[in-house]
């Protein structure tokens, strides 16, 4: 997360509803040179930020209705992280397939899709207006499943 100052950090929740989960988080500042991969990943999703300080966000706890959940119980690593870069590269070489699937699943027309992330629950595509998320019909367990979903042989 790019942040200005910890005391000035605000999380904006556009719509509150009865099924919202409230989170208590902690920010831990880090040096962008020591953790360049994290900075690169953020920039792939969001573009070049202004002069900022960088922070990791840890979920301390959450509340959902009357339940309180420890943050560690919500943190999972991306099971596809070791092959994510290869999947993104292959999908970005097949923009027509990504464009068609994006429109079919979300109704959003993305003229120049750029896949920036893949996890078992879906695919993130950067568009000129923001990130479009395609939910996986069933959790992806392999790159082959992702390619089959996009009809890439």
Which residue stretches match the model-derived regions?
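Binding-site signature for planar aromatic cofactors or substrates
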Residues: 1-153
């Amino acid at each position: 997360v790019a942040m200005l100052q910890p005391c000035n950090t605000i999380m904006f929740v556009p719509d509150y509803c009865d099924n919202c989960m409230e989170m208590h988080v902690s920010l831990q500042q880090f040096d962008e040179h020591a953790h360049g991969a994290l900075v690169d990943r953020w920039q792939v999703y969001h573009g070049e930020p202004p002069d900022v300080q960088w922070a990791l966000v840890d979920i301390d706890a959450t509340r959902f209705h009357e339940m309180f959940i420890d943050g560690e119980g919500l943190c999972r690593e991306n099971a596809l992280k070791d092959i994510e870069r290869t999947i993104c590269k292959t999908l970005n070489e097949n923009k027509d397939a990504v464009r068609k699937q994006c429109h079919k699943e979300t109704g959003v027309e993305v003229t120049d899709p750029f896949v920036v992330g893949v996890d078992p629950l879906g695919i993130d595509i950067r568009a000129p207006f923001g990130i479009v998320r395609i939910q996986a019909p069933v959790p992806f367990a392999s790159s082959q499943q992702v390619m089959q979903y996009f009809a890439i042989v």
